[in-house]
Regions:
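PRPP-associated nucleotide enzymes
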Residues: 1-169
Length: 169
């Protein structure tokens, strides 16, 4: 069992189906057994699954996360066009949306930020001070790429705005 099909496929398994709302699946020595805990359960979605949490190669409810993110970038351009020189993704999860934005707008995509791969998620730090420090340690601009350029920064989401505020300074 896995929350994303990609985890199963990486291990050479085959995705069979999703567990239904209110369903309990038990696998034991006698096989797989499915029980409905509640028959009136309604499926609920967390939008952050497609926007942020899921891997790009994951498919959730028949929607590929990469394609969802890329399409959101195209929609961003249509809804909020701007006159800039470069589209710069916030690594790593901002890339698919930035690609879509660049494709739809015709504005070149450029890697303008380098991510420190050893820094974890910044929005879950307990204090604002810790979040600010973590963002400064996590992302560094490529000055020779962004200097004197008008850029649009594309990130996957804004939870507290800490990353955005620090990057635009």
């Amino acid at each position: 069992f896995a929350s994303e099909n990609a985890a199963i496929e990486i291990l050479g398994g085959t995705f069979t189906r999703d567990v239904a709302p209110g369903e309990i699946v038990v696998v034991d020595s006698e096989g797989e057994h499915s029980y409905m805990f509640e028959h009136q359960s309604k499926k609920s979605h967390c939008i952050f699954e497609h926007i942020y949490f899921a891997r790009n190669d994951a498919t959730l409810d028949d929607i590929n996360s990469y394609m969802f993110r890329r399409r959101s970038g195209k929609i961003m351009w249509r809804e909020s066009p701007c006159d800039v020189d470069l589209v710069v993704p916030v690594p790593d999860s901002g890339y698919p949306s930035a690609i879509g934005y660049s494709q739809e707008s015709g504005i070149p995509l450029a890697e303008g930020l380098v991510k420190n791969r050893y820094m974890g998620r910044t929005f879950i730090k307990p204090t604002q001070e810790e979040r600010e420090i973590a963002v400064k340690l996590k992302l560094n601009p490529l000055s020779h790429v962004v200097k004197d350029k008008r850029i649009v920064l594309i990130d996957d989401s804004i939870v507290r705005g800490t990353t955005s505020r620090n990057l635009i300074q």
